[in-house]
Design a protein with these regions (language model features):
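Generic alpha-helical transmembrane segments
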Residues: 206-218
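Juxtamembrane membrane-interface segments at transmembrane alpha-helix termini
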Residues: 216-226
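Intrinsically disordered, low-complexity serine/threonine-rich segments
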Residues: 341, 348-363
Length: 364
């Protein structure tokens, strides 16, 4: 692992505020480890990701969710997830549900981009590229994450202040606190890491596995929300998804994360870089607490679905019945083919109707 310690503490602000020098294109592309270049790149990434997330990725994801065959099941489980995880009810309006989910999921595209930028340096493929390019890509990945987090925070604050009731509904305190806890990592570490340790391949690996891991886990989770685990084929798919998530989480959020986090803290402390040590300590603690929750949830789901059998337990039928009833309460109806029946032999179409406060099911 090659590490270059470039600058003393005062170098972080050597050009600011009155001595700011306009960086060259070459300096920007190579993410030169100086304050003027790093701050300029952070601003550039903020504008880039504001446009990409809100003008391109969110509309595309919204369209995908709007045209899903299992849309109602998908929206129901997403709504339940948000309420359970952070106490946020995204409401009963279908369009607002899809928009709220799409705004969160669009960030996974940024995570994938960041992971790809970090991969060559983090996993030893930098020698296949021209000198310095792999390091520059990884530094851009740090700033890519920082830029998204800046635009996300500023946009949500703007919506809370000027967006009226709808803006506050999309950005409740519980969500904002969760995002702030997440965003502290890039806020505190992105620019200092790029300036003090731009060649630290271990940090590049850590960012890569965290961003790729969370994107992969989100994808598996979202696909899992479309499955009916009472169906044998769907249950097999769910077991595979839970295994992928479990293995990914254990490696990226427990074993490798712990090693990289401790090594980075020891490195900064040994170098007597106490400013960076303090900046790294707070987000490391926040992420560690978050990782405990993620590992616990992944383990619980892994054990739950691998011990589950299809079509044999009354509990599954009761769960499916409650799901259909809740969807009926929210929508007033259940569209054909959007929620499949518990047992395949019943048929492929199920209607839900309310009679005398009881739910009756009719096969089509």
């Amino acid at each position: 692992m090659e590490i270059t310690k470039n600058l003393p503490y005062m170098e972080m602000t050597r050009n600011l505020p009155y001595g700011y020098a306009i960086p060259t294109v070459s300096d920007l592309l190579m993410a030169k480890p100086t304050a003027d270049v790093q701050i300029t790149l952070a601003i550039i990434h903020t504008f880039i990701w504001f446009y990409l997330i809100n003008k391109i990725f969110v509309p595309i994801i919204f369209w995908i969710y709007h045209n899903m065959k299992s849309k109602q099941r998908f929206l129901y489980f997403n709504r339940r997830l948000f309420k359970k995880a952070i106490g946020w009810d995204i409401g009963g309006d279908e369009n607002e549900q899809k928009l709220a989910i799409a705004r969160i999921d669009a960030a996974m595209v940024q995570h994938l981009v960041g992971a790809m930028l970090c991969f060559p340096s983090g996993f030893g493929f930098g020698h296949f590229l021209p000198a310095g390019v792999a390091t520059a890509m990884a530094c851009q990945a740090n700033l890519c994450e920082l830029g998204w987090e800046i635009e996300d925070t500023l946009m949500r604050i703007y919506e809370i202040i000027f967006g009226g009731e709808r803006g506050r509904k999309f950005n409740p305190p519980s969500l904002m606190l969760t995002l702030i806890a997440h965003h502290t990592a890039a806020w505190c570490m992105a620019i200092p890491i790029n300036m003090y340790y731009p060649n630290c391949t271990l940090q590049h690996e850590g960012l890569c596995i965290l961003q790729f891991g969370v994107a992969l886990n989100f994808l598996c989770q979202k696909y899992g929300f479309t499955l009916d685990v009472a169906n044998k084929r769907d249950l097999i798919k769910m077991k595979i998804l839970c295994t992928i998530v479990f293995v990914t989480v254990i490696w990226t959020r427990l074993f490798r994360y712990t090693y990289i986090g401790i090594t980075m803290l020891v490195m900064a402390y040994t170098d007597e870089n106490f400013l960076l040590f303090k900046l790294m300590l707070v987000p490391t603690i926040f992420l560690s607490l978050f990782n405990v929750i993620v590992v616990k949830d992944a383990t619980k789901k892994f054990l739950k679905f691998w011990s589950m059998d299809t079509g044999t337990t009354p509990k599954l039928q009761r769960q499916n019945t409650r799901l259909l009833s809740k969807i009926y309460d929210m929508k007033g109806s259940v569209d054909h083919n959007e929620v499949r029946p518990l047992y395949p032999e019943i048929g492929s179409v199920m209607d839900v109707s309310k009679t005398n406060s009881e739910t009756s099911f009719k096969s089509g």
